[in-house]
């Protein structure tokens, strides 16, 4: 994977970024001044990051796999240790499909009924391949979303959700919280700030 160097990341004009940020040069980045990236973040080939007014914020230790899309005018925020499997789509904007308005971005705003709402992913959230997350959703800490799920409602902490629409099907173990503590203790002396 061909990734941006630190100098190239600076030249992109990101709002800020931390250490060990690996973004594929094959990713598409729109409105980089509205994108903030923490430490230890990897964004793979063919991802689309289209930051609207709310921006996109990545915490630390985050992976965004190939072909993911983060799109919309609302904020999209990732907590530490969260990640997306391939082909996940997160939308913070949505057209009105009722027929009352015209749809698509080529139409002037006064003829559309686009709505915008923030999407928030807590710490340790993982979303399976091909899942779709709609505007206004909050995935609390530790949530797992199964592959090909459609998430239109908030998901409670450490729940495992699957389906279209996504429903809670189980409880996730919390052992990873202790592992997080151990990792943070190990990396404290060398942890750096944002660029």
Can you annotate each of these PLM segments?
Residues 119-120, 130-143, 149-152:
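Beta-rich strand-turn-strand
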Residues 4-5, 27-37, 42-133, 164, ...:
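Flexible, glycine/small-residue-enriched loop-and-beta-strand segment within the central core
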Residues 157-159, 165-181:
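Conserved beta-strand-loop-alpha-helix hinge in the C-terminal portion
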Residues 88, 95-96, 138, 149-150, ...:
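Flexible glycine-rich beta->alpha loop in the catalytic core of nucleotide-sugar glycosyltransferases
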Residues 153-158, 188:
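Short arginine-rich
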């Amino acid at each position: 994977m061909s990734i941006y160097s630190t100098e190239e990341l600076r030249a992109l004009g990101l709002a800020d970024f931390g250490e060990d940020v690996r973004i594929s040069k094959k990713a598409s980045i729109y409105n980089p001044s509205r994108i903030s990236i923490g430490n230890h973040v990897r964004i793979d080939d063919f991802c689309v990051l289209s930051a609207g007014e709310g921006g996109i914020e990545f915490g630390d230790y985050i992976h965004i796999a190939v072909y993911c899309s983060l799109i919309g005018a609302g904020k999209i925020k990732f907590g530490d240790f969260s990640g997306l499997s391939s082909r996940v789509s997160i939308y913070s904007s949505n057209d009105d499909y009722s027929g009352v308005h015209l749809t698509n971005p080529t139409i002037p705003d006064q003829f559309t009924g686009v709505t915008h709402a923030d999407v928030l992913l807590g710490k340790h959230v993982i979303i399976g391949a091909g899942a779709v997350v709609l505007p206004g959703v909050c995935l609390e800490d530790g949530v797992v979303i199964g592959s090909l799920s459609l998430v239109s409602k908030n998901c409670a902490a450490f729940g495992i959700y699957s389906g279209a629409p996504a429903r809670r099907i189980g409880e996730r173990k919390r052992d990873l919280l202790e592992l997080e503590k151990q990792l943070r203790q190990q990396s404290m002396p060398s942890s750096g700030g944002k660029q």
